[in-house]
């Protein structure tokens, strides 16, 4: 669920929120039309963002299936799901080089993030990385405790 929410926010931020913030007062249709008239391939940019957002969801679904099939522990599954979210910072950053850079070049605005939502994605990835470390320490502590009891 967290992976799907992250992917959805990543796509909405890249495709809707950031373009609207970069060009205040314009609609998405107007932005896309202006970019297309300038020679940018907007459908390709949109497809790229959707594809990169979908990769995490597919990885999470595959992890769930393999986890049930191989009877992986909940903590192991949590670590893998958190790793997918932590790694999401990379495609979230790279998505900015498609549509957002076209907007920056065409409209003469900054190519950086124009909303706080990119930061939310990065901080979520950072928190997921921290949670991986915490779960790893927990698993090691638990394993050591079980070994001393045996």
Predicted feature residues:
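Hydrophobic alpha-helical transmembrane segments of multipass integral membrane proteins
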Residues: 4-8, 56-61, 82-89, 123-133
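Cytoplasmic juxtamembrane regions at transmembrane-helix boundaries
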Residues: 60-87, 141-150
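Hydrophobic alpha-helical transmembrane segments
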Residues: 47-69, 126
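Membrane-interfacial loop-to-transmembrane-helix junctions in polytopic alpha-helical membrane proteins
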Residues: 37-44, 72, 110-120
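Hydrophobic alpha-helical membrane-insertion segments
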Residues: 1-16, 75-93
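Hydrophobic transmembrane helix segments
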Residues: 2-50
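Alpha-helical transmembrane segments of multi-pass integral membrane proteins
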Residues: 89-150
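Alpha-helical transmembrane segments of integral membrane proteins
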Residues: 50, 74-78, 116-123
């Amino acid at each position: 669920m967290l992976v799907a929410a992250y992917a959805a926010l990543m796509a909405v931020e890249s495709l809707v929120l950031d373009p609207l913030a970069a060009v205040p007062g314009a609609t998405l249709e107007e932005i896309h039309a202006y970019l297309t008239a300038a020679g940018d391939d907007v459908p390709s940019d949109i497809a790229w963002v959707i594809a990169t957002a979908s990769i995490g969801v597919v990885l999470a679904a595959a992890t769930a299936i393999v986890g049930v099939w191989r009877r992986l522990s909940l903590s192991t599954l949590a670590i893998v799901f958190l790793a997918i979210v932590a790694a999401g910072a990379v495609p979230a950053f790279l998505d900015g080089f498609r549509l957002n850079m076209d907007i920056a070049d065409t409209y003469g605005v900054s190519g950086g993030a124009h909303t706080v939502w990119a930061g939310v994605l990065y901080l979520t990835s950072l928190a997921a990385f921290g949670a991986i470390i915490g779960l790893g320490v927990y698993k090691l502590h638990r394993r050591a405790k079980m070994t001393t009891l045996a």
